[in-house]
Regions:
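Hydrophobic h-region of N-terminal signal peptides that target proteins for export
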Residues: 1-8
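Aromatic (Trp/Tyr/Phe) and Gly/Pro-enriched flexible surface segments
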Residues: 8-106, 112, 116, 122-126, ...
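Conserved aromatic beta-strand anchor motif in extracellular beta-sandwich/beta-rich domains
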Residues: 128-130
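Solvent-exposed strand-loop boundary residues in beta-sheet-rich modules
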Residues: 132-134
Length: 168
C-alpha cells in the first residue's frame, strides 16, 4: 500500500512532513522510511520510502512494486498490509503530531492509499491509532489494537487509489 499526504484538521495539517519530502540521509534501498523526517516504523521491519529522485526499486513512478505517481510532491511511503500465509510481515508508519489533539474538538483524518500494481491480494480494512506514547515492537510482527474506532473499511484496489477520511 502507498501513502501520501497524511492528516489534517480543516486547513491545518498536524502531521509534519506529510508528503515525505524532507529527508535526512541518502535514500539507497527499500525499508528506509526512517530517513523521512518525523517518520518511523514501530517494528523491526521498516516501511519503504520512494522518491522521484531515484530509480530502480525505490523510484517514482516505477519501482519494485510497480508504477505509482506521488499524489503530493515527489515522494511517498509504502507498507506491507497483508501477505499470504504471513510470508512477509506487515510494516507500519508512525509519526508524532505537531501539536496535541484537544478534547471536544473534531479532527478530520485524511490520507491517500493505493494498492501496488504487483500486489496479488487486497485488504478491506486499514486503521489509524492515536496514542500519547510511541508504539514500539522490537521484532517483526503484527500490531493489533482492541479499539477499532480508527478502522477504515474500504477495499483498496489498484485502480487509482482512494482518499480515506473520517472525523474524530
Amino acid at each position: 500500500l502507498i501513502f501520501s499526504n497524511i492528516l489534517g484538521q480543516d486547513q491545518n495539517n498536524l502531521v509534519g512532513n506529510p508528503s515525505f519530502e524532507s529527508i535526512d540521509g541518502k535514500l539507497k534501498k527499500l525499508t528506509q522510511i526512517n530517513i523521512a523526517k518525523g517518520w518511523y516504523s514501530p517494528t523491526a521491519l521498516r516501511a519503504d520510502l520512494f522518491s522521484k529522485d531515484k530509480e530502480g526499486d525505490i523510484g517514482v513512478p516505477d519501482n519494485f512494486y510497480g508504477k505509482e505517481h506521488a499524489k503530493d510532491g515527489e515522494n511517498y511511503a509504502g507498507i506491507v498490509a497483508y501477505s499470504y500465509n504471513n510470508n512477509k510481515p506487515r510494516t507500519y508508519l508512525q509519526s508524532k503530531l505537531t501539536k496535541s489533539l484537544a478534547g471536544g474538538v473534531d479532527y478530520c483524518v485524511k490520507f491517500n492509499v493505493s494498492l501496488s500494481d504487483l500486489s496479488k491480494y487486497a485488504i478491506d480494512k486499514i486503521g489509524i491509532h492515536f496514542g500519547s506514547d510511541a508504539v514500539s515492537l522490537d521484532r517483526k510482527g503484527d500490531i493489533i489494537f482492541s479499539d477499532k474506532s480508527g478502522e477504515f473499511e474500504h477495499i483498496i484496489t489498484p485502480m487509482g487509489g482512494k482518499v480515506l477520511s473520517a472525523r474524530y
